[in-house]
């Protein structure tokens, strides 16, 4: 497992699952760092059975197949309800893809809190990205920033604080609560409360390992993963708001340390610009690198849900 949400999974699997199964089902949870993994190799390891159960961010697999970007294209889901609807719509496509090509059974898809823009100088809206250097963490967010006239910069999460502090970058995109936890509020001044993307993650299992389990255990695990995924989506919505509150010092922040950032509320013009850039730049670039079947599946699911069309 990996990530902030991975911690939720670890607690759930190591405590809740044994309790609810009365000790009949237990799990040995290991983080990527403990296993010497970076993330992108997880799908291959699950496919071969080296790792039986795993969870990882879909964007890790984007370089292997652009279809893994489909539900998290920058600007596609400006709120958590849309993100969940998009995810649910496309989940059967992923289930088929992983099952047929990788011997992996998809159990569910959860998410991080909203990925939003932190800047170290005044920003009034998305249009102000023009001319700015912005740290991005995926190909689709890089294309989004560049379409707005900004320069995309790739750097590790741990390098962002000094980069913002020393003006190496003007802005950076991360989860609203992740940025708070890393004290980005100490080196940035403005936070734009408009989700750019979400970083959904898959929960999956090697198919052969799954088939060997007792049918009652499979039913139990499937039901519990569904509960876990629902809980993580609820937590992501809550933590997105907590990130806004705590970075800006709002009274609603549940943590003792509060930042003093300015919360920039998106205007109608911001939302329109987000939609325009996604449809005119992000979506066409993604469609160009994904297969014809991939684009067809997108249009039949996500496209139908949102009223958008991707074209090769």
Where are each of the predicted segments found?
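A gly/proline- and charged-residue-enriched helix-loop-helix capping module
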Residues: 78-98
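N-terminal secretory/targeting leader peptides
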Residues: 1-81, 99-312
